[in-house]
Amino acid sequence: MDVLFLSRLQFALTACYHWLFVPLTLGLGVVMSVMETIYVVKGDEAWRRIARFWQKLFGINFAVGVATGIILEFEFGTNWSNYSWFVGDIFGAPLAIEGILAFFMEATFIAIMFFGWEKVSKRTHLAATWLTALGTMISAWWILVANAWMQHPVGMDFNPDTVRNEMMDFFAVAFQPAAVIKFTHSVASGWMTGAMFVVAVSAWFLWKKRNEEMAKKSILVASIVGLVGTLLCMFAGDKHGVDIAKNQPMKLAAAEGLMQGSNEAPFSIVPGIEVPHMLSFLATHDWNGYVWGVEDLKQVGEEQIAEGKVALEAFRTYREHRDTNDSIAQQALATFQQHKAYFGYGYLDSTEELVPNVPLCYWCFRLMIGCGCLVALCFVLALFFGYKGWLPRYRWFLLLCMLCLPAVYVAGQCGWIFTEVGRQPWAIQGLLPVKAALSSVSAGSVLTTVILFATLFTALLIAEVRIMLKAIQQHKDEDLVVSD
């Protein structure tokens, strides 16, 4: 195992662990805020107790999510120092704003939310709850701005003297369409996760014939939030597909296992089952739109790599002669400027490196969609059965609700695996390959931290699950007032 593999493994491990907690924080924050709003509007003490119960679980998850997120950010400086130097001027800005604005906002209002029930007015407490939920979404915005920039770099210019990309347009970075789409899709999927968590836990209460009125009320609210999240996720997913087809065509080709481009590209449901023209429509909103295939992009990649080699050689010549021979340096700089759009391709040795792991992208994409559709169906049925008052009657459905909880997590994990693996070999699309972003560290030191982080994160996950299960199992609200 080399340093590159181990560094990627470490980052993938910590990112996947972190994303176990983030979507639940995003979704549960909205659900508990809606519940407290109902309490304030109706004055029903039952809703107050319901909101406080879900806030307790939110707090447990929030604490572990913060711990894993801090470790994740430090990895940019430890294992990926070349990356940090190359794009730190751009990438660091949204992360700094996230830490200064969103995190402090969350830290302030979460304290009022937990400890202010008997100390501030109902409306002040409600505002603190909503601001806590809003803070988590602001935090997600700036993190996703940074990630969107890695997928579609804009608003910067490369300085050959400092060997850094420098931000030229903050608003282009912060509000580019790719960031808006990614934020909407990711946060909406978080709403689905939080809502499914509430539905699943409530289904368990109904299965055990405990806290039944609380469970029924919770399922109604959560299923509505989940359906809103589902619709937003579908809308953003459609926009995301068009954006990928335009800016990351190799990722789309890998997701579909499409080797040869076509004007009538079919959508593959599973190998051997295809819907004619559907991929062309999804990618271009035209039934006969052209979709690039892997082999087509490899042919284009030959020219891009050749251009990149010219840019890389000119850059090295400029750096070598800029202090000793101005004419050679200026000539090299002119050559570099002419070819710099392909500078990152100069680090690649063959077109095979341009192709990500096609089977992994293909199946992760299908698992994401399949599990997402199952969860959406669960929300529809939960809302219908809940409205009719039939929830305790259908025990098979309660079991389905509980089984859909791991499904929503599988969908989220597979979505991010597809997003990041499909971008390979790039750390920053078209600018910096992953292999050029590494720090000068030994394989042994990286392996040690992989083992340490895996142990620590597993311990944190086990601790959270045990604490949550204990809180759920011990919760009693048998005197809940039924309010019509």
Which ranges hold each PLM region?
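Polytopic transmembrane helical bundles with strong interfacial aromatic enrichment
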Residues: 1-484
